[in-house]
Amino acid sequence: MVEFLGDVLYDLKEFSDTRFEVVALFRMIVASICGGLIGLEREMKGRPAGLKTFSLVCVGATLAMITNEYISRNFGGSGDLARMAAQVISGIGFLGAGTIIVTGTNQVRGLTTAAALWVTAALGISIGAGFYFGAFGGVGLIFKIGRASCRERV
């Protein structure tokens, strides 16, 4: 057991990069806030997915990108860095599909929630890659689109 803990501590010291770890933590916090804001807005409107779901999706996508960067830095990864992002985007489609229902009257419900989850994953990828301008612009546009769609129709 002591030998195992020694190996773990050695690995932590060997691969520790304090600056990278601080940046990674910052990115996850930003993702949590951005995803949480979108989720809170959806929750306040009584939609099926809310604060926790959107925060988790955004943080998860961010973490996937951070992990991708970590692997590339520490293990000489010459692989395609965009591959992880592509897998997140396609994988989130399955989660979004679970929110879509077609009622007995052929009315589709949950489509906007699915789209919002998808775009939140894209925000997480953006944050995980360190592209904050794109992420913050995306959050602003999401709120603008959400408000525009809530106006009364004549």
Regions found by a protein language model. Name each.
Residues 35, 61-65, 92-99, 142-146:
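Alpha-helical transmembrane segments of multi-pass membrane proteins
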Residues 1-84:
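Alpha-helical transmembrane segments and their membrane-interface boundaries
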Residues 13, 77-85, 89, 102-118:
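Interhelical loops and loop-helix junctions of multi-pass membrane transporters/channels
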Residues 69, 85-95:
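Ligand-binding beta-strand-loop-alpha-helix segment within the catalytic cores
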Residues 56-66, 90, 114-127:
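Small-residue-rich segments of transmembrane alpha-helices in multi-pass membrane proteins
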